């Protein structure tokens, strides 16, 4: 009976199981399992295990081939309790048997036990070898212990194993997983010999850390060194191309995969290619890849659904979902729900939310994060907050989503508070966190804090990240520092379409439309294809700078040369441009021929043009259309009020005021912000609360007299009666917040330095004239950003050309 059972064991554990640890085994993965309730393999019966133990008791030979094979068999079959019991009965186990046990614990995801067993091995005086350390290092990575990793690395150096490629590959993976790219680079650079796994570990490690640029650069270096990419290299490189938005490089890697036949029949490589084109917005390419796939698993379907959803093809996304379920018999999983959410309006989003709850997909960290994204984009911030607060487990991506939701909904100070909370936690902000929070600094007007986060970016190895640099360009531009915005743009090595759009729009809002146009020509010369946002920025530049002919040329070239259908935003820019000429009959004709129903914003463009040309008839017509859509549009009421007051139509002024009061509409209080010595100072109209009030008003009086201003002005939106206005100083433009902030900036900054002020409303004409003269008088550049554009006052002139 015993002989029969032993022969059965020999048949089960053939000679292949006796091979020592190979390079393939170095890649073994396993999930962490905190207890010992492991899954038992039915291949070994309980009687067989008993016979093996009895054999050891009889033979007392540690090197008995049957027992060695049995121990290896227990470990390979994840029967670690039996393996441990058999091992403990062996008095003198050699390094091979210790390695078998460590490998077994690691393969089962029992990383703590594996590290403890290694310590026991060292304590027993058994010398570890090059087969020991790859699994020990993998277990250290599994418990995320950098301290233990450093100790193991030191031991590897002491034993002279740093020349072993498998040990070094494991160290690279360890350091990359723990976010220590510098240590991984050092190991990689000092390796006397590298294999494809060495390169793959570095390339995928950079990508996992959000450094797609370094990942791509290393992939190129690998090719130069004569290594042929395998499926893992290819998938990592494709992911890096998506991360840094490098369509040209992505297509080159795709072509290489086709030539090397890497993509043939490999569903994961094909899915990576599909995902890359999806993120580029190349839906037709993605469809071609998807339709050409011989095999499609749930991952491929999910990517295609996500492709449609991400690129605004909502109907196609749901049709693809339906086809997957009905024609292919695949059941939607949690990722399907995640990918459908971007295509969902609030109603469909709640439906998917309910479906996920019914299917038991929740709680699920990734799905909950996607729900936060969806509710944030739909303006349902409260729902997003509820989901975030109820999450049992949060990672940095969850924090990124709720921060982005706050920023998207204009809650910039809440976003900054949440970012500080994340900063104080054990989690480390990643590149997406930084890119998400930078717009909040731009909108909160905190340039000094923006510079602090910029310094962090440089120190945190994100200085080559295109997405972050794009956000920095936007932040500096919106904070009024066009020079630093340009410096960040120049630092971008892989400039994508967002990079060019950001810098084109930056110069546009600062009134330098000619430079925006020149940058567009540079963009085309760099072979970066423009998109809808590019032309929106370009047309805005033409409108702000009064380049009418150029604007028409770019508008007509959108469809003709680039195949881009103009959207409602482009028609709005063109209406601004036409309105600038004062040709309102042409503007009305343009509105009638427009293939869209005019929005309140479109009518607002006409209203603004009528204000600049003092055409009250057109203004009343445009305002009437706006009130049909937005009866409580504060800006529209205030603009009409100003126009009536400037025309001396006081009855209409009173009528508008009464109408605003009846609707509970109040005028937005003017507030100006200026930074001095790293601190923001806020002023309101007639403000006397500042500690330097006396000095501010002294400077204001001196400058006002020197520029030849009178002491009293009639303010057009005063609530006082017309006959009383001339007797009042309280509403004089001399006390407007933008002047107070400017004067404080003049006395609190070094002589000759630029003064930058942000104002939340449009500055009045009197203040505009004052600032022009003040810039010439003080020989200082004064930059004022109002609710529409930035004004660069220098030597008595403004970049807006007196049209804003």
From Swiss-Prot:
Keyword Lipid metabolism applies: no
Annotated PROSITE patterns: PPR (PS51375)
Statement: the UniProt record of this protein carries the keyword Cell membrane: no
Record region (Type E(+) motif): 678-708
An annotated Gene Ontology molecular function: RNA binding
SUPFAM superfamilies: TPR-like
Sequence ranges of the PPR repeats: 63-93, 94-128, 129-163, 164-194, 195-229, 230-264, 266-296, 297-332, 333-363, 364-394, 395-429, 430-464, 465-495, 496-530, 531-561, 567-597
Residue range of the transit peptide in the UniProt record, numbered on this chain: 1-19
Region (Type E motif): 602-677
Entry keywords, A to Z: Chloroplast, Plastid, Repeat, Transit peptide
Subcellular locations according to the entry: Plastid, Chloroplast
Positions of the UniProt region annotated as Type DYW motif: 710-804
GO cellular component, one term: chloroplast
Entry-linked InterPro entries: DYW_dom, E_motif, Pentatricopeptide_rpt, PPR_At4g14850-like_plant, TPR-like_helical_dom_sf
Superkingdom assignment: Eukaryota
Family recorded in the similarity comment: Belongs to the PPR family. PCMP-H subfamily.
Matches recorded under PANTHER family: OS03G0241800 PROTEIN, OS07G0578800 PROTEIN-RELATED
Name of the protein: Pentatricopeptide repeat-containing protein At4g35130, chloroplastic
Organism of derivation: Arabidopsis thaliana
Gene behind the chain: PCMP-H27
């Amino acid at each position: 009976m015993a002989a029969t059972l032993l022969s059965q064991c020999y048949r089960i554990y053939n000679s292949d199981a006796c091979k020592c640890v190979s390079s393939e085994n170095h890649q073994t993965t396993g999930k962490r399992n905190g207890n010992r309730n492991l899954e038992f393999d039915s291949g070994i019966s309980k009687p067989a295990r008993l016979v093996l133990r009895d054999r050891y008791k009889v033979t007392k030979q540690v090197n008995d081939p049957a027992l060695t094979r049995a121990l290896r068999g227990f470990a390979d079959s994840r029967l670690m309790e039996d393996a441990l019991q058999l091992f403990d009965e062996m008095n003198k186990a050699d390094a091979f048997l210790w390695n078998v046990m460590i490998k077994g614990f690691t393969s089962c995801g029992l990383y703590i036990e594996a590290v403890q067993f290694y310590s026991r091995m060292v304590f027993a005086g058994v010398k570890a070898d090059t087969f020991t350390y790859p699994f020990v290092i993998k277990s250290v990575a599994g418990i995320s212990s950098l301290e233990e990793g450093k100790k193991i690395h030191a031991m590897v150096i002491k034993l002279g194993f740093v020349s072993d490629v498998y040990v070094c590959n494991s160290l690279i993976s360890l350091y990359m997983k723990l976010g220590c790219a510098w240590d991984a680079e050092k190991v990689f650079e000092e390796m006397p010999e590298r294999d494809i796994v060495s390169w793959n570990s570095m390339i995928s490690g950079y990508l996992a850390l959000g450094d797609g640029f370094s990942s791509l650069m290393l992939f190129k270096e690998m090719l130069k060194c004569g290594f042929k990419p395998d499926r893992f290299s290819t998938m990592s490189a494709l992911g890096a191309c998506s991360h840094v938005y490098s369509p040209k490089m992505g297509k080159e890697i795709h072509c290489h995969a086709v030539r090397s036949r890497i993509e043939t029949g490999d569903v994961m490589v094909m899915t990576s290619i599909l995902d890359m084109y999806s993120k580029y917005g190349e839906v037709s390419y993605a469809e071609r890849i998807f339709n050409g796939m011989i095999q499609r698993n749930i991952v491929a379907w999910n990517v295609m659904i996500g492709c449609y959803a991400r690129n605004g093809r909502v109907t196609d996304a749901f049709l693809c979902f339906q086809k997957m379920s009905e024609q292919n018999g695949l059941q939607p999983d949690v990722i399907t729900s995640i990918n459908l959410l971007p295509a969902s309006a609030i109603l469909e989003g709640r439906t998917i939310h309910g479906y996920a709850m019914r299917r038991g997909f929740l709680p699920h960290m990734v799905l909950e994060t996607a729900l936060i994204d969806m509710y944030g984009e739909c303006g349902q911030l409260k729902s997003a907050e509820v989901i975030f607060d109820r999450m049992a487990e949060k990672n940095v991506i969850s924090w990124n989503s709720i921060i982005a939701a706050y920023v998207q909904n204009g809650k910039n100070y809440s976003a900054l508070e949440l970012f500080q909370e994340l900063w104080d936690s054990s989690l480390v902000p990643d590149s997406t966190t930084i890119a998400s929070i930078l717009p909040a600094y731009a909108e909160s007007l905190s340039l000094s804090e923006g510079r602090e986060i910029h310094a962090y970016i440089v120190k945190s190895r994100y200085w080559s990240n295109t997405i972050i640099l794009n956000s920095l360009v936007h932040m500096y531009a919106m904070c009024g520092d066009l020079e630093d915005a340009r410096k960040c743009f120049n630092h971008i090595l892989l400039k994508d379409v967002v990079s060019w759009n950001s810098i084109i729009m930056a110069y546009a809002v600062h009134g330098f439309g000619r430079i925006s146009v020149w940058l567009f020509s540079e963009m085309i010369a760099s072979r970066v294809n423009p998109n809808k946002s590019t032309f929106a920025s370009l047309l805005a530049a033409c409108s702000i700078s009064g380049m009418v002919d150029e604007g028409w040329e770019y508008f007509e070239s959108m469809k003709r040369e680039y195949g881009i259908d103009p959207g409602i935003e482009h028609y709005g820019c063109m209406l601004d441009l036409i309105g600038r000429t004062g040709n309102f009959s042409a503007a009305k004709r343009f509105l009638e021929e427009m293939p869209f129903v005019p929005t309140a914003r479109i009518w607002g463009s006409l209203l603004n043009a009528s204000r600049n040309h003092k055409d009250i008839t057109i203004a009343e017509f445009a305002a009437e259309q706006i009130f049909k859509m937005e009866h409580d549009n504060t800006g529209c009421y205030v603009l009409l009020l100003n126009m009536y007051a400037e025309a001396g139509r006081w009855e209409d002024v009173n009528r508008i005021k009464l109408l605003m009061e009846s609707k509970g509409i109040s005028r937005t209080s003017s507030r100006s912000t200026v930074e001095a010595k790293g601190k923001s100072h806020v002023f309101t109209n007639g403000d006397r609360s500042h500690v330097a009030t006396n000095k501010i008003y002294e400077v204001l009086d001196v400058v006002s007299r020197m520029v030849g201003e009178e002491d009293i002005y009639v303010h057009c939106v005063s609530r006082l009666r017309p006959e009383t206005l001339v007797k009042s100083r309280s509403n004089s433009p001399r006390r407007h917040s933008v002047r107070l902030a400017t004067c404080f900036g003049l006395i609190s900054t070094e002589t000759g330095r630029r003064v930058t002020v942000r104002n939340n409303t449009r500055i009045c004409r009197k203040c505009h004239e004052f600032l022009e003269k003040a810039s010439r008088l003080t020989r200082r550049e004064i930059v004022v950003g109002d609710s529409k554009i930035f004004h660069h006052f220098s030597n008595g002139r403004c970049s807006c050309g007196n049209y804003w």
